[in-house]
Swiss-Prot record:
Keyword Phosphoprotein assigned: no
Binding residues for Fe cation 2: 49, 79, 155, 194
Name of this chain's protein: Probable cyclic nucleotide phosphodiesterase RPA0124
InterPro entries: Calcineurin-like_PHP_ApaH, CNP_phosphodiesterase-III, GpdQ/CpdA-like, Metallo-depent_PP-like
Note accompanying the cofactor annotation: Binds 2 Fe(2+) ions per subunit.
EC number: 3.1.4.-
Listed CDD domains: MPP_GpdQ
Lineage start: Bacteria, Pseudomonadati, Pseudomonadota, Alphaproteobacteria, Hyphomicrobiales
Highest taxon of source: Bacteria
Family, similarity comment: Belongs to the cyclic nucleotide phosphodiesterase class-III family.
Keyword annotations from UniProtKB, A to Z: Hydrolase, Iron, Metal-binding, Nucleotide-binding
Residues the record lists as binding Fe cation 1: 8, 10, 49, 196
Length: 274
């Protein structure tokens, strides 16, 4: 099974820009590349912060761009989102009995669990898992088929990464999440967004991938405190392949427009410049 991961689209109303960028331009470029190069993917998942201010015109704009995707989409909530505004333009997206945007989808190759970490009451954008969401997670992990990998997706990381300000707005109750995992089942892979940086590693024995943002980025700065250092580093998406014996993640810089050449080309090898 193959799929694509995007995150932190931070959409705004048509005609608006944030930090000098138009998120719609970037997502349109990603959609075109995905349609052209990945016709065999099962879905595209967007792991939250769909809209920057959670306003209805932004979700309207997002829906228009995503309509161009040929693959199905799985959409998630991030700290910038508003569930009710989102639901007006994406009425077909499943919500659980408590109204949270989270699902379990069982594919032949893997089980996909999406977890809603949005806390709309938080003044500082940190995530939270209430009792209802922890119960959802416990049931999802306990009931997932044992004969295939389980991939867990959530917006907020449940751990620090060294990005000092971002560490103050991660998941607020990571121990509660871990307690559920410890008594049920460890996901085979954990996918997240929120940090606007490409980060990978292992959390308590679980390999993880944090996807770079589609819009503005968080600069690689492990010293800055009291604010979030931003940058215009180029965006990318992750192309994930799930096989019986491996999970492979490739990053695609879909807006790169520089030269392409063969490393076996002796002329290219000795060129001074392109």
């Amino acid at each position: 099974m193959k799929f694509v991961v995007l995150t932190d689209t931070h959409f705004v109303a048509r005609g608006r820009r944030i930090y000098g960028l138009d998120p719609a331009e970037r997502l349109s470029a990603a959609v075109a590349r995905i349609n052209r190069e990945h016709p065999d993917i099962a879905f595209v998942i967007v792991t939250g912060d769909l809209a920057h201010w959670g306003e209805e015109p932004a979700y309207d704009n997002l829906a228009s761009v995503l309509a161009g995707l040929r693959a199905p989409t799985i959409l998630m909530m991030g700290n910038h989102d508003k569930r009710e505004a989102f639901a007006k333009f994406f009425p077909g997206v499943p919500r659980d009995a408590s109204g949270f945007v989270q699902t379990v989808q069982v594919f032949e190759a893997a089980t996909i669990v999406t977890l809603d970490t949005l806390n709309e009451a938080a003044p500082n954008h940190e995530g939270f898992l209430c009792e209802a969401r922890l119960a959802f997670l416990e049931h999802a992990l306990a009931e997932a088929p044992a004969d295939r990998p389980l991939l867990l997706f959530q917006h907020h990381p449940p751990f620090d990464t060294g990005l000092r300000y971002m560490d103050t707005i991660r998941l607020a109750n990571p121990d509660a999440e871990w307690e559920v995992i410890a008594r049920t089942r460890k996901p085979d892979y954990l996918f997240m967004g929120h940090l606007h940086r490409p980060i990978s590693g292992v959390w308590r024995g679980i390999p993880f991938h944090i996807q770079r943002g589609l819009a503005h980025q968080v600069a690689f700065d492990l010293v800055a405190e009291g604010h979030i250092p931003g940058s215009h580093e180029p965006p990318d998406y992750a192309h994930v392949s799930v096989e019986a014996d491996r999970i492979v993640i490739h990053q695609c810089s879909f807006m790169y427009d520089g030269p392409l050449f063969s490393l076996h080309d002796s002329v290219a090898l000795h060129r001074v410049s392109f």
